[in-house]
């Protein structure tokens, strides 16, 4: 709450203390997400894809990933998922989640398909003393002569480049998908909860002024 003109420190502290904040946004998001996930999704996919969904990316089960994606789309307007694979076979595939703020740059073709995506990551690596330290790195996904290529660069400008394979073959598209309030796509859409956030803030300020 901003300090009102002429308020002393004591008056300003009392002004803040008497204001009541009721988390309308938090309760609404929790309720809407709960409604969306109460029923199991109908999944039509090959067995290997079903197995992929049962694997836990970064400790997240598929249901948890679904819950997180729904919350993020409501609160910040987007959520990214990378279907990742090292230079191996199908059984090595994993799903990597990315928050909105980690999707820092991208380009798409005329059909809206990504041709370039840059992601920000924080990984915890051993520091040599038995502890771990947070390391910032950037993952760049692009098509090089029509082949999906991944380059990872850390803060020391050390880079590693691979061409992931699925079923032993390189692929000709970038397997990164962004969910937004209107479906799948990289377009920046209006955050669903922004109007309710503004109303919640207005109620909070009115409470401070009138109570």
Predicted regions and their residues:
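Generic low-polarity alpha-helical segments
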Residues: 21-24, 32-33, 148-150, 200, ...
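Extended, Lys/Arg-enriched charged tracts that mediate electrostatic binding to polyanionic substrates
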Residues: 67-162
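Extended, charged amphipathic alpha-helical segments
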Residues: 160-211
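Small/flexible residues
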Residues: 5, 20, 29, 134, ...
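Extended, helix-rich architectural segments
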Residues: 1-95
């Amino acid at each position: 709450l901003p300090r009102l003109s002429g308020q002393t420190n004591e008056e300003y502290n009392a002004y803040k203390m008497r204001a009541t904040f009721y988390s309308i946004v938090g309760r609404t998001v929790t309720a809407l997400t709960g409604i969306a996930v109460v029923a199991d999704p109908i999944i039509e996919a090959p067995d290997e894809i079903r197995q992929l969904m049962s694997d836990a990316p970064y400790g997240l089960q598929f249901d948890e990933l679904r819950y997180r994606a729904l919350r993020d789309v409501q609160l910040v307007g987007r959520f990214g998922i990378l279907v990742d694979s090292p230079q191996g076979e199908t059984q090595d595939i994993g799903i990597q989640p990315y928050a909105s703020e980690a999707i820092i740059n991208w380009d798409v073709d005329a059909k809206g398909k990504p041709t370039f995506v840059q992601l920000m990551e924080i990984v915890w690596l051993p520091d040599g003393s038995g502890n771990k330290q947070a390391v910032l790195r950037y993952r760049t996904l692009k098509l090089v002569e029509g082949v999906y290529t991944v380059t990872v660069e850390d803060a020391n400008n050390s880079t590693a480049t691979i061409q992931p394979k699925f079923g032993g073959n390189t692929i000709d598209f970038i397997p990164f998908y962004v969910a937004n309030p209107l479906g799948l796509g990289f377009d920046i859409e209006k955050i669903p909860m922004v109007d309710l956030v503004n109303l919640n803030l207005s109620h909070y300020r009115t409470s401070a002024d009138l109570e």
